[in-house]
Amino acid sequence: MADTTSKEVPLHSVQVEALVVMKIVKACAATYPTTATGSIVGMDSNGTLQITNSFPFPTADVAASDSHPNDHMAASNIAAAAPRSKANIVYQSEMIKMLKEVNVDANNVGWYTSANMGNFINTSLIENQFFYQKEPNERTVALVHDVSRSAQGALSLRAFRLSPNFMTAYKEGKFTTENMQKSKLTYKDILVELPIIVHNSHLLTSFLHQMPVELPKKELDFPASLADLTRNTPPTPLYPNLESLDLSIDPYLERTCDMLLDSIETHYTELNNFQYFQRQLTREQAKVTAWKTKRAAENASRATQKLAPLPEDEWERLFKLPTEPSRLEGMLNARQVDQYSRQVDGFTASITGKMFAVKSNLLPEQS
C-alpha cells in the first residue's frame, strides 16, 4: 500500500546528496569537453526523489596521438548514447547488484549527463530519458550538469523529466502538424524541470556547526608616529577596483550568442524544409483535384451512354503525396533557442549598463 500511495504522488522535487554532487562534478570535469554520462540511484519518498549515489558509465577511449578532428564528436556521440546501450545496461545492473550487497540504496532513479554552454537539448537527451521513463509510473529524472557554467563559480545542476503529453506523442511517433494541433503540444511542453535540493548528512551538518565561525582576531599594532608609518610602508599599495568598469564582454555571453545564432539558423533551415514540403503537397493536391474533376466528367459522359463508371480511387496509385517531415527536430531546436535566450537574458543585466555608458560617451548629443 505504501508503494502504491508513493507512486500516486507526482514528483515535485529532487534531493541530491552532496557526495553525489561532487561525484557528478568530478566525472563531468574529467571528460570535458567530451560528454559524460552515468547512472544515479536512490528512492522516492512522498514525491521527493532522493538521490543517494551515482556511478559513471564506461566510455570508449580515443587515442590522442593519431586523433582526427572528428574523434571528439564521435566520442561525444558514443557517450551520449551510453545510457541506453546494451553493454551499459548490463554494467548498470551489475553495479546495482553490488550496491545491494553493501546495503546501499540500489533503486535506479535515472541518469546524469554533462553539458557545455547550456547545449543539452537534443535527440540523445530525449531518447535516453524516454528509455528510463517509458515504463508506467517510472520515477526517473535526468540530471544535467553544465561544466562551463559551473566553472564560473556557481554550481549548475538541473533535473528534468519528459512531460506526459510529450511521452504520449513520442510513443506514437507522430510529430505531424495535425497531431500537434490536436494535442496542443509545443516546444514548452517537452521537458518539465524539477527543483533540486542539495542535502548533507546529519554527521556532516554537525561537523559544520561545530567548526569555528570566526577566526581568532589579534590586536593590530598601529603606528605611533608618522615616522613609523613611513618606515614600514605596505609592500602593496591599495588601488581602486576598476574591474567593474572593464568594457570587455563576458566570453561566456559571447559564446552563448554565437550558439544562439547557430540555433536560429538551424530553425530557419527546418522552416525552409517544411515550406518546401507544403509547396510540393500543394502541387500534388492540385494534380489530384484536376484528375478527379476529369474523371468525374468522364463518368458523367459514360453515365449518359449507360456504361459502367470508372473507379475514382485510381489517383492513389497514380499520384504519391509527399510525407510530412517530423516536427520533432524543430521542436527541440526551438526549445534550445529558448534555453539560450534565457541564458543571454541572465547575462545582459551587467552588460547593458556598460553599453549605455559607452554610447553616452561616444554619442553625447543623443544622450
Swiss-Prot record:
SMART domains reported for this sequence: JAB_MPN
PROSITE patterns: MPN
Keyword Cytoplasm: yes
GO CC field: eukaryotic 43S preinitiation complex; eukaryotic 48S preinitiation complex; eukaryotic translation initiation factor 3 complex
Keywords: Cytoplasm, Initiation factor, Protein biosynthesis
Cytoplasm recorded as keyword: yes
GO BP term (any one): formation of cytoplasmic translation initiation complex
Main location: cytoplasm
Cellular localization per UniProt: Cytoplasm
UniProt domain MPN: residue ranges: 14-166
PANTHER family according to UniProt: EUKARYOTIC TRANSLATION INITIATION FACTOR 3 -RELATED
Function of the protein: Component of the eukaryotic translation initiation factor 3 (eIF-3) complex, which is involved in protein synthesis of a specialized repertoire of mRNAs and, together with other initiation factors, stimulates binding of mRNA and methionyl-tRNAi to the 40S ribosome. The eIF-3 complex specifically targets and initiates translation of a subset of mRNAs involved in cell proliferation.
Assigned protein family: Belongs to the eIF-3 subunit H family.
Description of how the protein assembles with itself and partners: Component of the eukaryotic translation initiation factor 3 (eIF-3) complex.
Protein name: Eukaryotic translation initiation factor 3 subunit H
Originating species: Sclerotinia sclerotiorum (strain ATCC 18683 / 1980 / Ss-1) (White mold)
